[in-house]
Design a protein with these regions (language model features):
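Active-site metal-binding loops of divalent metal-dependent hydrolases
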Residues: 3, 39-40, 77-78, 134, ...
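Short, solvent-exposed loop/turn segments at secondary-structure junctions
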Residues: 7, 42-44, 138-141, 165-168
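An N-terminally biased module of ancient metal coordination in phosphate/nucleic-acid-related enzymes
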Residues: 1-68
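Histidine/acidic-residue-rich catalytic or RNA/ligand-binding cores of hydrolases
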Residues: 141-148, 167-175
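Metallo-beta-lactamase
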Residues: 4-13, 144-151, 159-162
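Extended substrate/RNA-proximal surfaces in nucleic-acid metabolism proteins
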Residues: 46-158
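Active-site mouth loops of central-metabolism enzymes
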Residues: 5-16, 103-110, 164
Length: 175
């Protein structure tokens, strides 16, 4: 599950108490395993694997203290930009979902240069790329061709649940 549950490292949970509250709510909905995916985005969210693992451990310890049984793991949601391009070029290890699946996103407002090249390089390093919330890339409009190219490259897609409803409008529903 793509979620921002680790406290204070991105636009998700602001603190440990909120993280625990969110996890309890997800448990009540029937989720038995959670994989939190904090943003890794240049200077805005400069999260490293060690920072993410440290926060994961703090949440796991809080769950144990409160006697909440919940399987919780962490990966990351990587923003495809020049910082990520360097990480890929330098072959830095990425935090992945099971099966070396790496969750990626790019700018929602303007096209990102070199997206396909970065995806290809990650694939050459053995990663399976998942594109997060493709319905949000408004500049693509109804350009199904770009999505088809990514699909043909072997990318998977992770939608927001609301993308399956009329919430985002007819263009998104048509995609």
């Amino acid at each position: 599950m793509h979620a921002h549950l680790l406290p204070g490292i991105d636009d998700g949970s602001p603190d440990l108490d909120t993280s625990i509250e969110l996890i309890r709510s997800l448990q009540e909905l029937g989720f038995s395993k959670l994989i939190t995916t904090p943003h890794v985005m240049g200077d805005m969210y400069p999260n490293s694997p060690s920072i993410i693992r440290e926060r994961l451990t703090s949440v796991q310890q809080a769950l144990i203290r409160q006697e909440i049984s919940q399987e919780l793991d962490a990966a990351a949601e990587y923003f495809l930009d020049e910082v990520m391009e360097r990480r890929i070029r330098d072959n830095e290890p990425l935090l992945t979902l099971p099966g070396k699946r790496v969750l990626c996103e790019f700018s929602m407002l303007t096209p990102t240069m070199g997206v396909k090249e970065m995806i290809f390089e990650m694939q050459m390093q053995g990663y399976q790329v998942i594109i997060a919330h493709p319905e949000r890339y408004v500049y693509l409009g109804s350009n199904k061709g770009f999505y088809e190219e990514l699909k043909d490259m072997g990318c998977l897609f992770q939608l927001n649940l609301l993308a399956l409803t009329p919430h985002y409008g007819k263009t998104v529903s048509a995609l």
